Amino acid sequence: MLLTRALFIFYVTVVALPAKANDEAYLYVLGVAQDAGYPQAGCYQAHCMPGWEDPSLRRGATSIALIDPAAKTKYLFEATPNLPAQLYALEKEAPSEDYTFDGVFLTHAHMGHYGGLMFLGHEAMGGKNIPVYAMPRMQSYLRSNGPWSQLVEFNNIALQPLAHNKAVTLAGVSVTPLLVPHRDEFSETVGYLIKGANKSALFIPDINKWSVWETEIAQIIQTVDYALLDATFYGDGELPGRDMSKVPHPLVTETMQALSGLSVEDRNKVWFIHMNHTNPLLNPDSEEANTVRANGFNIAVEGIRLPL
């Protein structure tokens, strides 16, 4: 995967959406990789080496921010192990002197989605009742297991309850958690439907195969303006020795096939995100990335804005 700095800059320029518009709420992409980021710890294979040798090619674990200029608030979706860098990126986009950091929405208890909560504790930021929105099992896990329980006991975070398909209203934006099937060892797993004044987004960074979800993914995409979808693995053969059909994620090739009947307009709503370090979509010049774009889909990169 021979990425170059120039190619990366070109690619971001091509896909970045329009700059901030007045007081319109928007989503801001902070990370696009699977839980362990790119390059992954301990990976010194050819596909990881560009990231070690050129820091500009590194990618953080998947996270998006909700920024509301009218309400002067900002929220995170996911607290990743890359939280320090992602908070800095958010600070540059929405400075704390102008925006209040009003909370974190969690999807589930896998390392790349909640591990960054540790930086809110007294050894680091020393947060003061930072709202953390979580489903019941996720809340119970945080309350009952250290070191997370200390965040609750020391009032670094203030757990906020969520319920399936029950909207949380945040000034001019609503956030609705949707239960999705996944490896739920420690908590439920949810995606989020995020609705602004004009547009809406579906955020599902982790899910098992689309066929085991009670919701038809093609149908829901027709009802939203953006769909940031699980793209952990691209296709067959990506993990040597593994039967990719049994990996509990929808392959990008499977998702494209499932959505092939949609109009080009609807396919344009899809932004693939949460890419494993093996995923060739991390290389914007790869044959696979070209195939995705040729079929009308998008590949998320850090720094894009999705106006709501």
Report the location of each language-model feature:
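Sec-dependent signal peptide recognition
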Residues: 1-11
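N-terminal signal peptide c-region/cleavage motif recognized by signal peptidases
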Residues: 14-18
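Core dinuclear metal-dependent hydrolase active-site scaffold
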Residues: 22-92, 96, 159-220, 304-308
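A short helix-to-beta-strand connector/capping loop
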Residues: 23, 128, 152-158, 171-173, ...
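Active-site metal-binding motif and surrounding structural segment of the metallo-beta-lactamase
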Residues: 60, 67-133, 223-225
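Structural beta-sheet core signal
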Residues: 104, 134, 202-203, 272
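A short, active-site helix/loop in glycosyltransferases that binds the activated sugar's phosphate group
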Residues: 137-146
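Cap/insert and terminal regions of metallo-dependent hydrolase folds
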Residues: 198-200, 207-305
